[in-house]
Amino acid sequence: MRPDTLTAEPDRFSDAAWDLLLASQEQARRWRHNEMDVEHLLPVLFSDARYASWIDPLPLDPEALLDQLDDFCADQPTGSGRELYIGEALEALLDGAERRRAVAGAQLIDVPQILLALLEDPRLGRPLLVAQGLSEDLLLRQQRH
């Protein structure tokens, strides 16, 4: 974990966003991965009922996304260590969500900023979501409703 990581500051996140990160930890542990990364956050976002109000209005096929994410996670190396590190892609995603928070003038990083930052993630978020027809414009329009 880098010293300036946002994950060291839970008070910078809404409860929903922090809970998303905590549940992502469990996903990483379930896969026996040593790094928690974007591929662990996405399944929680698409399958946990707490995030349905943000996900359900979007033109996404959560089942197809979850299948793709399972395949991706299965291809990642497993580890035997007890330490769980924050992956670089997740750090970059959270930095992007922080930038989105600042632009929006929001007090805390919340799920909408994380969703927008996912569209900037070149490794996994953007390819999966754009292939499903999600765009920043569409996401911003949905968030206004």
PLM-predicted stretches and their roles:
Residues M1-H145:
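Histone-fold recognition with a strong bias for associated Lys/Arg-rich disordered tails
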